[in-house]
């Protein structure tokens, strides 16, 4: 009986190991291969910095992709009439989508983001670790304000 039990448990463990397990949608799985940034038109070559915005117009919904968090902030600011259902960012260290309410941003010009802003979206645990290490960490609103200042310091204020 003991031998049969061990054999049965071995089979159960092997089956459990072999069965597919659910996983979070990886960012690279969710960004279409031909996606271009809705703001600057660049292809989304590095999904670690990608962002997306789900917008609606009546009954229709669309997903806008961005190559850099800064482009999403710019698009948000320059298109105030959009009905935004969700803003999501690829968060580090393991790229996956997270809603804007659940992310923070590391601000560091040395981070090589596609548009050079140096904004890296991270989850709460990573934000706490980075803040404790002395790095600059901003909320969604703080990162949006940083991007606005970053753009205006380089290109001037937009004309009304």
Regions found by a protein language model. Name each.
Residues 123-160:
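C-terminal partner/receptor-binding element of secreted or periplasmic proteins
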Residues 21-81:
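N-terminal secretory signal peptides
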């Amino acid at each position: 009986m003991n031998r049969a039990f061990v054999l049965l448990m071995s089979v159960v463990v092997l089956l459990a190991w072999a069965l597919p397990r659910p996983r979070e949608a990886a960012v690279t799985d969710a960004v279409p291969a031909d996606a271009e940034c809705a703001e600057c038109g660049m292809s989304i070559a590095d999904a670690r910095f990608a962002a997306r915005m789900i917008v609606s117009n009546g009954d229709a919904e669309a997903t806008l992709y961005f190559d850099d968090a800064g482009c999403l902030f710019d698009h948000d600011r320059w298109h105030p009439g959009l009905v935004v259902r969700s803003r999501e960012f690829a968060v580090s260290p393991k790229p996956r989508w997270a809603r804007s309410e659940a992310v923070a941003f590391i601000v560091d010009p040395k981070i090589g983001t596609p548009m050079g802003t140096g904004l890296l979206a991270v989850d709460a645990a990573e934000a706490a670790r980075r803040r404790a290490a002395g790095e600059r960490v901003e909320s969604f609103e703080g990162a949006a304000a940083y991007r606005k200042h970053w753009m205006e310091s380089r290109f001037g204020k937009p004309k009304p």
